[in-house]
Swiss-Prot record:
It is an enzyme of class 1 (oxidoreductase). The keyword Oxidoreductase applies. Its EC number is 1.6.5.-, 1.7.1.17. GO terms for molecular function: electron transfer activity; FMN binding; oxidoreductase activity, acting on NAD(P)H as acceptor; oxidoreductase activity, acting on NAD(P)H, quinone or similar compound as acceptor. InterPro entries: Flavodoxin_fold, Flavoprotein-like_sf, FMN-dep_NADH:Q_OxRdtase_AzoR1, NADH:quinone_OxRdtase_FMN_depd. It catalyses: 2 a quinone + NADH + H(+) = 2 a 1,4-benzosemiquinone + NAD(+); N,N-dimethyl-1,4-phenylenediamine + anthranilate + 2 NAD(+) = 2-(4-dimethylaminophenyl)diazenylbenzoate + 2 NADH + 2 H(+). Binds 1 FMN per subunit. FMN binds at residue 10. This is FMN-dependent NADH:quinone oxidoreductase. Its cofactor is FMN. HAMAP family: Azoreductase_type1 (MF_01216). Belongs to the azoreductase type 1 family. Quinone reductase that provides resistance to thiol-specific stress caused by electrophilic quinones. The gene is azoR.
């Protein structure tokens, strides 16, 4: 049985571009993969998405409950689908908090300062798909490429299979279309990635 984890970092409870992309993705993926165990981690509701790393909690931040449990689940999973709309030119703060909890030396990557040689990732088992959106067209803010940043982070952790769909320019390009109509424009791209997942 394939274990697939949905990491929901969208601040919208439902009906957002990323949620609609997820619906399309799952419809295609599950049509070909009947034996799948889906888990959803809503980072708006879980402590792992709410607790940020700071001086007050530095000694207890990387706990079994908020780090190891999630790291073990990632290592046991076939794939991860991340809902990541752009927020202030980056992925949401809840996703940053999650990444801080699970990107741990010698658990998700071998730290070059601990072991001889360069760092190497320990999440090579994972396939990662990011479903993103942003108000501005791609390239308007090169320093704010949140999906490419996630590609780099997961690559560092050993993920070789990374794909993404990003609906960009939502504030400019699609004023006269419903969100569903916009998502339909990306259907072929979503389906192609879902079929390879």
């Amino acid at each position: 049985m394939k274990k697939v984890i949905i990491i929901d970092a969208s601040v919208s409870p439902s009906g957002s571009y990323t949620h609609l992309l997820l619906e399309r993705f799952l419809a295609t993926f599950q049509a070909k993969n009947k034996d799948v165990e889906l888990s959803t981690w809503n980072l708006n509701e879980l402590p792992v998405g709410q607790i940020s790393y700071n001086t007050q909690n530095a000694g207890t931040f990387f706990s079994v409950e908020n780090s190891d449990k999630y790291i073990d689940a990632l290592k046991a999973a076939h794939g991860v689908i991340i809902l990541a709309p752009m927020t202030n030119f980056n992925y949401p703060a809840t996703l940053k908090n999650f990444i801080d909890h699970v990107f741990v030396a010698n658990k998700t990557f071998k730290d070059k300062y601990v072991t001889k040689g360069a760092s190497s990732g320990m999440l090579g088992n994972l396939k990662v798909v990011v479903l993103g959106s942003q108000g501005a067209p791609l390239g308007w803010y090169p320093w704010g490429d949140h999906v490419n940043s996630l590609r780099g982070l997961f690559g560092f952790a050993g993920v070789a299979s990374f794909a993404s769909v990003i609906i960009d320019g939502t504030k400019l390009l699609y004023k006269d279309k419903s969100k569903s109509e916009v998502v339909d424009m990306f259907a072929k791209q979503v389906d192609a990635i879902a079929n390879e997942f």
